[in-house]
């Protein structure tokens, strides 16, 4: 009796005097861990892994986008400093809030 194992399909073919029989065996690796037997089990596992990877990628992209566009404390401080400097350099601030638009007042006439 000659037995030829087939590792791809999990079956072995035995032949005795022209008759061929097929026996199904359970696929296991060297550590005796379970190997899925049909495509639906593999598909379910792959679907879960793909969804996890997609979610991870989306969250990483969102985090990077928010970090680029989110105003930091340094940005806020710089903006406030620039605004304060701008207020100090305006003519009305220099002249004590006097009206500087009219060169001649009514008193000069």
Swiss-Prot record:
Residues 91-102 have a biased composition (Polar residues). The keyword Transmembrane helix applies. It is found in: Host membrane. It is a single-pass membrane protein. Keywords: Host membrane, Membrane, Transmembrane, Transmembrane helix. The keyword Lyase does not apply. Its main location: host cell. The chain crosses the membrane at residues 42-62. It comes from the Viruses. Residues 1-25, 84-109 are annotated as: Disordered. This is Uncharacterized protein N. It comes from Bdellovibrio phage phiMH2K.
């Amino acid at each position: 009796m000659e037995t030829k194992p087939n590792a791809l399909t999990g079956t072995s073919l035995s032949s005795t005097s022209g008759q061929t029989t097929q026996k199904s065996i359970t696929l296991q690796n060297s550590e005796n861990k379970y190997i899925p037997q049909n495509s639906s089990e593999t598909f379910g596992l792959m679907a879960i892994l793909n969804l996890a990877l997609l979610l991870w990628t989306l969250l990483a992209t969102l985090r990077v986008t928010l970090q680029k566009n989110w105003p930091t404390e340094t940005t806020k401080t710089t903006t406030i400093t620039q605004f304060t400097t701008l207020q100090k350099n305006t003519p009305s601030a220099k002249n004590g809030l006097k009206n500087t638009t009219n060169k001649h007042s009514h008193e000069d006439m």
